[in-house]
């Protein structure tokens, strides 16, 4: 499937508390997948659309849940999409998230196994990869934890070949697909194979997505572990299909600026 590659916000949810009324005990808030679940002190549980209008108190400030929507991804559980408004002491508010490629300012909480919960926006790589079907709390049909595919997807979307920094540019078109059938190739005309991907970065690189940001020679020099796996002769989908570390693949436009 073909997508553009914006980068977006991801903020931690450490010390997350839902605003309670005077004299009320603070309710317990948890994250299940991409859904907030609130358990009140009387045992009542609120979740989904019932939390529209609630206010989250974070170290960064107060964030109001303005609305809640749902969508079904290509694979995995239902995704909850929240519109978050950051409120200030003067009573005004502003959107937490920048517009995604569809012009929507949405986000959701995310609980990755073994990591603190956080907020992510749909315009960023972390959020986009969840919506692609790579839900880090889920298993593939083959029993592989999708946490590995999600991290590989984040590397892919950001063109993070060595696992240390992204080299993409906002709005760059890419065609994402994988060996498990969660995302299928779009075969967009003019696109060519770019790389195969793992949770640690690229497994091989046929050519860089944005050559002005990093060249093949720079990739060879910066990432010795990719020696022998750089360039079109050394890196192709056919060769990588059998590589155990190659989970995701992508195509992009040669010479894209």
Q: For the regions a protein language model found, what residue spans apply to each?
A:
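Boundary at the C-terminal end of the N-terminal hydrophobic targeting segment
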Residues: 23-27
């Amino acid at each position: 499937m073909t997508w553009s590659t914006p980068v977006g916000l991801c903020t931690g949810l450490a010390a997350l508390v839902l605003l309670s009324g005077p004299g009320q005990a603070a309710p317990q808030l948890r994250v299940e997948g991409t859904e907030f679940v609130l358990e009140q002190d009387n045992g009542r549980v609120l979740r989904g659309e019932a939390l529209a209008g609630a206010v989250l108190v974070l170290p960064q400030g107060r964030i109001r849940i303005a609305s809640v929507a749902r969508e079904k991804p290509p694979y995995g559980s239902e995704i909850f999409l929240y519109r978050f408004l950051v409120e200030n002491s003067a009573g005004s508010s502003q959107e937490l998230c920048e517009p995604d490629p569809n012009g929507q300012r949405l986000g959701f909480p995310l609980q990755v196994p073994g990591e603190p919960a956080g907020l992510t926006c749909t315009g960023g790589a972390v959020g986009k990869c969840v919506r692609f079907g790579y839900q880090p709390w889920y298993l593939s049909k083959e029993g592989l934890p999708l946490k590995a595919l999600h991290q590989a997807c984040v590397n892919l979307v950001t063109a993070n070949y060595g696992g240390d920094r992204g080299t993409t540019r906002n709005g760059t078109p890419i065609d994402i697909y994988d060996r498990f059938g969660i995302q299928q190739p779009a075969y967009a005309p003019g696109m060519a194979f770019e790389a195969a991907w793992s949770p640690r970065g690229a497994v091989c690189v046929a050519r860089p997505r944005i050559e002005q940001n990093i060249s093949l020679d720079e990739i060879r020099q910066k990432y010795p572990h990719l020696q022998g796996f750089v360039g079109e002769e050394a890196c192709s989908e056919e060769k990588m299909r059998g590589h155990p570390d190659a989970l995701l693949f992508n195509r992009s436009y040669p010479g894209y600026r």
